[in-house]
Design a protein with these regions (language model features):
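A short, surface-exposed loop/turn module that caps and links secondary-structure elements
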Residues: 32-57, 85
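Arg/Lys-rich, positively charged N-terminal/basic patches that mediate binding to nucleic acids
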Residues: 1-29
Length: 93
């Protein structure tokens, strides 16, 4: 059963415009191929403040997501140097 992909509004507004087109297509392909079919097999669980969330590595970029039943909520796509601090600010109320 394929998972439905949902994106945080900041992914399209803030994250994707910062990534060059070739890398963006590579990330999109990885999301479609891996997260839509088996997110727990391809992703790695995060710890500490991001416990309950997962990451998918695509080159120097990280896709941070959460699996909720049959949905995959993608919270951010950022360079590995800044992804975790940027995502943590999105989770604060």
């Amino acid at each position: 059963m394929p998972f439905a992909l949902r994106y945080h509004p900041a992914v399209r507004g803030d994250d994707l415009p910062l990534i060059d087109r070739k890398t963006r297509e590579r990330i999109r392909g990885a999301i479609e191929e891996r997260l839509r079919t088996a997110p727990h097999e391809y992703g790695e669980p995060l710890r500490k403040t991001l416990k309950g969330y997962w990451k998918l590595r695509v080159g120097d970029y990280r896709v941070v997501f959460k699996v909720i039943k049959s949905d995959v909520l993608i919270l951010g796509i950022r360079h590995r140097k800044s992804v975790y601090t940027d995502i943590s600010t999105r989770l604060q109320p």
